[in-house]
Amino acid sequence: MSDGAGAAARRWGKCGGRSCSRESIMVAFKGVWTQAFWKAVTAEFLAMLIFVLLSVGSTINWGGSENPLPVDMVLISLCFGLSIATMVQCFGHISGGHINPAVTVAMVCTRKISIAKSVFYITAQCLGAIIGAGILYLVTPPNVVGGLGVTTVHGNLTAGHGLLVELIITFQLVFTIFASCDSKRTDVTGSIALAIGFSVAIGHLFAINYTGASMNPARSFGPAVIMGNWENHWIYWVGPIIGAVLAGALYEYVFCPDVELKRRLKEAFSKAAQQTKGSYTEVEDNRSQVETEDLILKPGVVHVIDIDRGEDKKGKDSAGEVLSSV
């Protein structure tokens, strides 16, 4: 066996088997196996559980009427907004206070958290939503449970309309989150949690009659699991996630790009341009067309070949007269 083949075999022995897979997984999930990380995951689970229990509980219709009154819509909107503001204030310093899979996906797309971390976050959020909705179902009398706050598109609207509405209201929510939590800003003096809560409340005031105003895939997922109602459920994942990614990308890369990121991108583009250009720098050459037809470039020296006379006329060194700089 040759030395190259032997080296390849040794590498395969180390990285081709089960041990390499284990090491690769450990590297991919670096930072996950810490106490702080699991505290953050638990915080997302608990925050979502409480949020769904309190906010979805406000949608329970105790009066027996088919449609909620305008005053009830205001109550629902305020309950959702104040609930999320409270949870962000309580758990924001532990987990970042995502409490929304769409927000977590936006954070991944803007390189604020890792993909591995987002997987655990979204799983915890969905489990919290299911348990929160389950507790609400258990403590609510059967005759008033109704749909348990399952989000549905209005009967006069198509799925496309619902998708667009969810995209828009989630866009404004996530843009508010990025703008309020921007560490580069020095003009933010109010409560970040309250700003996020107001954004959620505004989205509900506008969109309750359209789609139920989800803005949060986990919030829709929990009641849907408990009630087994999956009608147009995909809208409440696709719409919010697209809106969140658009908002995060626009804020981070267009409106308020990070200075360090801009510098790195500029350096990368400059380096790529230099590599594409090559080792020679073009300069103006005032010689006649006949004289420059056969120009051979060598590092530091220019040679002109006169075909008629078969002579090799050596040009001046680039240090003496600039013909081409290397």
From Swiss-Prot:
According to its record, how does it sit in the membrane? Multi-pass membrane protein
User: Which UniProt keywords are listed?
Assistant: Cell membrane, Cell projection, Endosome, Glycoprotein, Lipoprotein, Membrane, Palmitate, Phosphoprotein, Repeat, Transmembrane, Transmembrane helix, Transport
- Transmembrane spans: 40-60, 73-92, 119-139, 159-179, 188-208, 235-255
Q: Where is the lipid attached (S-palmitoyl cysteine)?
A: 15, 20
InterPro entries xref list: Aquaporin-like, Aquaporin_transptr, MIP, MIP_CS
Question: Which ranges make up the Cytoplasmic topological domains here?
Answer: 1-39, 93-96, 105-118, 180-187, 256-326
Which locations, inside or outside the cell, does it occupy? Cell membrane; Basolateral cell membrane; Endosome membrane; Cell membrane, Sarcolemma
Q: Does the keyword Amino-acid biosynthesis apply?
A: no
Q: Which residues carry this modification: Phosphothreonine?
A: 292
Q: How does it assemble?
A: Homotetramer. The tetramers can form oligomeric arrays in membranes. The size of the oligomers differs between tissues and is smaller in skeletal muscle than in brain. Interaction between AQP4 oligomeric arrays in close-by cells can contribute to cell-cell adhesion. Part of a complex containing MLC1, TRPV4, HEPACAM and ATP1B1.
Family from the record: Belongs to the MIP/aquaporin (TC 1.A.8) family.
Quoted from the entry, the domain comment is: Aquaporins contain two tandem repeats each containing three membrane-spanning domains and a pore-forming loop with the signature motif Asn-Pro-Ala (NPA).
Report what the protein is called. Answer: Aquaporin-4
Organism, per UniProt? Answer: Notomys alexis (Spinifex hopping mouse)
